[in-house]
């Protein structure tokens, strides 16, 4: 890590931390007014933003980015409108800052109240998704947190265009200048950013396994780990076939490149003939490459043999691996061994089996008879999300406004001293 780079970022972080302390005191009305102005500014500047994105896409193709990554990188008028709508939805949400979440009276007459407060200055590291820039700025602003954004080099023009537009709109409405900063896209910035103690309250990495692993292993700042999604669907012996087909296709085909897409399918041995055959037919028809265990390969010669590395891998592509299991207990043990604690699902008509599954599976979201694709801040009613946390401290699942706050105790007395 270059000392000059660290010192430069340190100055930026010091300035942003001061602005963040001021942001924590900004009333909800001003924050909401700023968010709505930011949404309008995205719509007004859509041509310039799309032009910057075209430059990034051309650079990405020259770099040899996969079609999956190019799809994540690409902005369209529809996606820009979605970003604007997300900012308006965040404006409409209840502000968690200042919320009283508990209180009681001490025997000595003290009034003790627990109140929500912002975390502070947050560093967000992400890869080829320009939409994260708008979501992160919007959520951090509403929750009273400053933000240092470090996007990928492949999206640098898009990220700079979006953040410039949003910062100008926010500051014009009274948001303290300096509390939103877009950092350079160079990889070296990551190493410096994750060591900016004591200025950063938290770092959130959002991207592939290698990025998240690097941040977790090297950060001296607290890290909120957002998850790689090796998500499973288990089709139990009692599963309704048509329901299973709808869920599997939705979870795998709708958007294969996202973290809540299904990557693995477990099928009970008693349903191999009745359920596996039509499920394979559906997957083949949608152009999904199927890999499988020996029993799956023996059942369908079009299935490729899965290696050990497949079972723990997040494909983020039109690929799925299938395992035939002998029992629900085996399915649970398999998922807890190979899963990434993100989203797991069971398709079953047996209530007791569903109860056992939800109790035993260690994941941020566990589904009964529904697609894993619902693990999303918008779908959960959070407006937007910074990411999906797969750890247990301090937040788990979609990270929205409430998850970007902590609490403090306000104790009021009338001269009491401890006896």
Swiss-Prot record:
GO cellular component terms given for this protein: cytoplasm
Cellular localisation: Cytoplasm
Known EC number: 1.2.1.41
Known function: Catalyzes the NADPH-dependent reduction of L-glutamate 5-phosphate into L-glutamate 5-semialdehyde and phosphate. The product spontaneously undergoes cyclization to form 1-pyrroline-5-carboxylate.
UniProt xrefs under Gene3D superfamilies: Aldehyde Dehydrogenase, Chain A, domain 1, Aldehyde Dehydrogenase, Chain A, domain 2
One Pfam family in the UniProt entry: Aldedh
CDD domains assigned: ALDH_F18-19_ProA-GPR (cd07079)
Alphabetical UniProt keywords: Amino-acid biosynthesis, Cytoplasm, NADP, Oxidoreductase, Proline biosynthesis
Disulphide connectivity of cysteines: none
Catalyzed reaction equations: L-glutamate 5-semialdehyde + phosphate + NADP(+) = L-glutamyl 5-phosphate + NADPH + H(+)
InterPro entries referenced in this protein's UniProt entry, alphabetically: Ald_DH/histidinol_DH (IPR016161), Ald_DH_C (IPR016163), Ald_DH_N (IPR016162), Aldehyde_DH_dom (IPR015590), G-glutamylP_reductase_CS (IPR020593), Glu-5-SA_DH (IPR012134), GPR_dom (IPR000965)
A Gene Ontology BP annotation from the UniProt entry: L-proline biosynthetic process
Protein name: Gamma-glutamyl phosphate reductase
